From Swiss-Prot:
SUPFAM superfamilies xref list: beta-beta-alpha zinc fingers (SSF57667)
Name of the protein described by the UniProt record: Splicing factor 3A subunit 2
Residue ranges, compositional bias (Low complexity): 370-392
Entry GO CC: catalytic step 2 spliceosome; nuclear speck; nucleoplasm; nucleus; spliceosomal complex; U2 snRNP; U2-type precatalytic spliceosome; U2-type prespliceosome
Function per UniProt: Component of the 17S U2 SnRNP complex of the spliceosome, a large ribonucleoprotein complex that removes introns from transcribed pre-mRNAs. The 17S U2 SnRNP complex (1) directly participates in early spliceosome assembly and (2) mediates recognition of the intron branch site during pre-mRNA splicing by promoting the selection of the pre-mRNA branch-site adenosine, the nucleophile for the first step of splicing.
Length: 464
């Protein structure tokens, strides 16, 4: 047989297999696959005869090899005969009874009654969880028996109509009757320490406690409101610092007339120092405050304020907040505008009073007015600078400016004038702010001052 010149052949290789060879190879391959899944020795219908061939006892067919028999078992004829045989056997076989369910034997014992119990309602002070504590007494419990419990739904019991708002906690122990407690149908907290049971064998008491889960987060605890007039305890310190004072509910209304707002009271701790003089409330718009009465000192000398160095003998610092005037030029009083250019000032020593202002009574000193007075036209205020002091002279207090040249210091025993008040000539009392002092009176025409005693009256001038 020529294998070299067949169509489809390749030089140096075998020829193309015939159809018979391909079928044989296919059957062998299927037999190997069938033997891997089917154990032919366990087939009840497989039989090998004395001729060495194989027979099918169900279909009565003859097969030359195992592959042929395995192919037969997968065919339609063999499958049909298997179904027919199974139906026949099922018809002829007797009906077998269904397997019985396992029955649980109910213990039968003589019940002696209900046990004693005690229920305690509890509430956790920290978390606010509600809990129930049950104490059941079983003094005559059977030997080797431990009480048992379980939760029962309202739909499992047959004693009351079912209500989903409630559930039942059952307690059982021989020979006592089973008792049940009706509790709210809420979720039980099974966390560690929230659900526990204990059986005391000595006292024959059974304890059970469970907590309900929190439905809402606990609200922060609030201090109870005490009776009126009783102050609450101060709040705890945070980081070692006291809490801030509460802010005012509403700001004070603005003053009428467009006046500036009064300063807010300080919120911090009060300064450690001597209390100052009492301050009067601001006057209403258009109303002038009464002038305070100033009594002369007993000895004529006042001690200096705390924190202020006394000046050297013969040197007095000027009043705080007062700029030294230029030599020969007096600044106008507060509230009086400087004259316009081209208008001659009044005669020296004669000052007309302001409209609506009456001259003060003798012996009445006006209150000091703080502030800086405007200068006359063409006069420049002194620059805010500090001049070196002479040896042995203490520097002035903060806010005080040195005096200009030509201004003589006050003699010892005379106090500096108040802020914003210019010194007056001897024997003349200062007037109210905005009013120029009157013309000095002759020595014999002015009344004696209170500080001048009977022996301090100056002698009359000599007559010609």
């Amino acid at each position: 047989m020529d294998f070299q010149h067949r169509p489809g052949g390749k030089t140096g290789s075998g020829g193309v297999a015939s159809s018979s060879e391909s079928n044989r190879d296919r059957r062998e391959r299927l037999r190997q696959l069938a033997l891997e899944t089917i154990d032919i020795n366990k087939d009840p219908y497989f039989m090998k005869n004395h001729l060495g061939s194989y027979e099918c006892k169900l279909c009565l067919t003859l097969h030359n090899n195992e592959g042929s028999y395995l192919a037969h078992t997968q065919g339609k004829k063999h499958q049909t005969n298997l179904a027919r045989r199974a139906a026949k056997e099922a018809k002829e076989a007797p009906a077998q009874p269904a397997p019985e369910k396992v029955k649980v034997e109910v213990k039968k014992f003589v019940k002696i009654g209900r046990p004693g119990y005690k229920v305690t309602k509890q509430r956790d002070s920290e978390m606010g969880q509600q809990s129930l504590l049950f104490q059941i007494d079983y003094p005559e419990i059977a030997e080797g028996i431990m009480p048992r419990h379980r939760f029962m739904s309202a739909y499992e019991q047959r004693i009351e109509p079912p209500d989903r708002r409630w559930q039942y906690l059952l307690m059982a122990a021989e020979p006592y009757e089973t008792i049940a407690f009706k509790v709210p149908s809420r979720e039980i907290d099974k966390a560690e320490g929230k659900f526990w049971t204990h059986w005391n064998r000595e006292t024959k008491q059974f304890f059970l406690q469970f907590h309900f889960k929190m439905e809402k987060p606990p609200a922060p605890p609030s201090l109870p409101a005490g009776p009126p007039g009783v102050k609450r305890p101060p709040p705890p310190l945070m980081n070692g610092l006291p809490p801030r004072p509460p802010l005012p509910e509403s700001l004070p209304p603005p003053p009428p007339g467009g006046l500036p707002l009064p300063p807010m009271p300080p919120t911090g701790p009060a300064p450690s120092g001597p209390p100052g003089p009492p301050q009067l409330p601001p006057p209403a718009p258009g109303v002038h405050p009464p002038a305070p009465v100033v009594h002369p000192p007993a000895s004529g000398v006042h001690p200096p304020a705390p924190g202020v160095h006394p000046p050297a003998p013969g040197v007095h610092p000027p009043a705080p907040g007062v700029h030294p005037p230029t030599s020969g030029v007096h600044p106008p009083a507060p509230g009086v505008h400087p004259p316009a250019p081209g208008v001659h000032p009044p005669a020296p020593g004669v000052h007309p009073p302001a409209p609506g202002v009456h001259p003060p009574a003798p012996g009445v000193h006006p209150p000091p007015s703080a502030g800086v007075h405007p200068q006359a036209p063409g006069v420049h205020p002194a620059a805010p600078a500090v001049h070196p002091q002479a040896p042995g002279v203490h520097p002035p207090a903060p806010g005080m400016h040195p005096q200009a040249p030509g201004v003589h210091p006050q003699p010892p025993g005379v106090h500096p004038s108040a802020p914003g008040v210019h010194p007056q000539p001897p024997g003349v009392h200062p007037s109210n702010p905005g009013v120029h002092p009157p013309t000095p009176m002759p020595p014999m025409l002015r009344p004696p001052l209170p500080s001048e005693g009977p022996g301090n009256i100056p002698p009359p001038p000599p007559t010609n």
